Swiss-Prot record:
Glycans are attached at residue 254. The keyword Repeat does not apply. GO terms for molecular function: cholesterol binding. This is Repressed by EFG1 protein 1. Residues 59-118 are annotated as: Disordered. GO terms for biological process: cell wall organization; sexual reproduction.
Length: 271
């Protein structure tokens, strides 16, 4: 009888233990019980573009003024406190993050202009052609290719970006500069920049943060371009860097013409 009672007690203990386990399982939160997982990884691609704006060069001083370099889609600009002290020259203002005004001889405004790109000929020909296709729509002269600008662009494309946490930050060099990420080849970056035409107010052509790539692209007094690309992360794909000389997006009054630099250099499409 004692053995029977012992066996019954053991069986009861086992039943309680199993019941407790079952109770714990079925009272678990639904968040724990129902976890779904996708069987296929989807890679999202990203893209954005960036440009810079600068004040026109000032002839009578060599004072440097600091300015915060733009990031993501924001841009900054500098306007003259005295528009009449600025005159149009063929020399670009020297920096995106630091805007410098100085007396520069016009002979320094020209970089080497070479018909044959030094690297990635197919990309260079494609992106130069697309620049000039867009410029022709506005009746402004075609750009010529500069190996020096392209080499500068390539150096910055190779060293200026962290693909694990991409931030399109400008080089701060002496040229106009357009940046893009996520657009492949030589045509799609230019098309993305040109698409900003839809946001231009042709009754009041001026600086805006949303149209700077377009205005640099068609800037009449710009004569040379050099571009480069760098393959980045899977998400961002290609980074595109284009350098321009003389640089565009100059803010201020051209005392020679009596118009703003934007009115003189950003022309509406031909009809």
């Amino acid at each position: 009888m004692k053995i029977t009672n012992t066996l019954l007690n053991a069986a009861a203990l086992l039943a309680v233990t199993e019941a407790a386990t079952i109770t714990k399982f079925f009272t678990a939160s639904t968040q724990t019980l129902f976890v779904t997982q996708t069987s296929q990884t989807v890679v999202a691609t990203k893209s954005f573009v960036e440009t810079i704006y600068s004040a026109p060069p000032k002839q009578l001083t060599s004072k440097t003024q600091d300015s915060t370099s733009p990031t993501t889609s924001s841009v900054n600009s500098l306007t003259s406190s005295s528009a009449t002290s600025y005159v149009e020259t063929t020399t670009p203002a020297p920096s995106s993050s630091t805007l410098t005004t100085s007396t520069i001889s016009s002979s320094t405004a020209s970089e080497d202009s070479d018909a044959t790109p030094t690297a990635d000929v197919e990309f260079a020909e494609e992106i130069l052609k697309e620049h000039n296709v867009k410029r022709a729509l506005h009746g402004v002269p075609a750009l010529s290719w500069s190996n020096k600008l392209a080499e500068y662009a390539q150096d910055y494309a190779n060293t200026g970006f962290d693909c694990s946490n991409l931030n399109l930050k400008h080089s701060g060099g002496p040229y106009g500069e357009n940046l893009a990420a996520g657009y492949m080849g030589g045509i799609s970056p230019v098309d993305a920049w040109y698409d900003e035409i839809s946001m231009v107010d042709w009754n009041n052509v001026d600086f805006t943060e949303s149209t700077g790539h377009f205005t640099q692209l068609v800037w009449r007094s710009t004569t040379q371009v050099g571009c480069a690309k760098m393959m980045c992360s899977t998400a961002w794909r290609q980074i595109t860097v284009c350098e321009y000389l003389p640089r565009g997006n100059v803010i201020g009054l051209n005392v020679t013409s009596g118009h703003s630099y934007f009115v003189d250099n950003v022309l509406p499409p031909l009809k």
